[in-house]
Amino acid sequence: MSRLKIDLRSDTVTHPSPEMRRAMAEAEVGDDVLRDDPTVIALEQRAAQLTGKEAALFVPSGTMGNLVCLMVHVPRGGEIIGGAGNHSFAHEAANFAVVVGASMTLLPWDADGRMDTAAIARAFREPSDEHEPLTSLVIVENTHSDSMAQPLPPGYIEAVAVAAHDGGVPLHVDGARIFNAAVALDVPVAELLRAADSATFCLSKGLSCPVGSVVVGSADFIRRARRARKLLGGGMRQVGVLAAPGLVALRDGPSGMVERLAEDHANARRLADGLAGMPGITDLDPERVRTNFVFFELSRPELRAPFLEGLTAEGVGMLDYPGGTRIRAVTHYGIHEQDIAETLAAVRRVLAQIGLAPAPVPA
């Protein structure tokens, strides 16, 4: 069990709400491989409705969700176009290569996580050249986690879709935190995904479920994705006990988990505003905190490890972001305004301990 009182390492650390736990205990179940589980069916129907797609598929994880989409879209030897450092490339154990047998062309992105659509078009391979792989898919991530979880607006997603479709390939949206994007932009998720041929979203991040993601797309796409899920060992039996929290999370209004994401965004901004004024904290523009991620650096990056160790001793968890370039804090269900105040006080004490700031004046 974590010793952390305030765990800001990720929104994956969330615990299910009491109502989710009750829903799990009382879930009506059946054999989902035989398509007999009514709770899973209800979740998939709700997900399809919210995303504006024909059908949906419950999967154990976001990694599996993205992978089954790649397996459907990309033939062996095909190539995927994505942004440098995108999640499927950098954080999913190279499954696009190991399982799908695909390669990936990586394009630079701007500060908001946007690839240039003209660059996407230029990245397409010449299909008549037998020396080259076949361009098979464009993938985009929304929110864009490496860029302070910036939400990408519908117009940009549609422009990427045009570039993909003009080249004769589909667009997949890795929407692990697509509901954060929708709340930040005040647009329906269906509008964000209108131009996408497939998408995934995660239930176990900001939506606070204990497990699971959902793949959405056309009915034919989901039929093929179901087969890919089976190949990966993702077909489960009485899995309504895991799908039930997802139905709670996707409810409309305050009884669900989507609307309350605005609280996480507000807490992230409070944290950023407080950190930005502290000596020793650099590379943080609070205006760029639009969802639930806060990235920052120390004026002496070599002190990153003792800083994080000091916070852990204070009961506060943050993350040395992969690549060792920044520190990350993520707000989520279970983190309240008072926790942000306590975190800021802990940061002040630790900065003083490691010599980056004067000792705080006792209250």
Regions flagged by a language model, labelled:
Residues 1-298, 305-314, 319-335, 340-363:
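Conserved PLP-enzyme active-site core in the AAT-like
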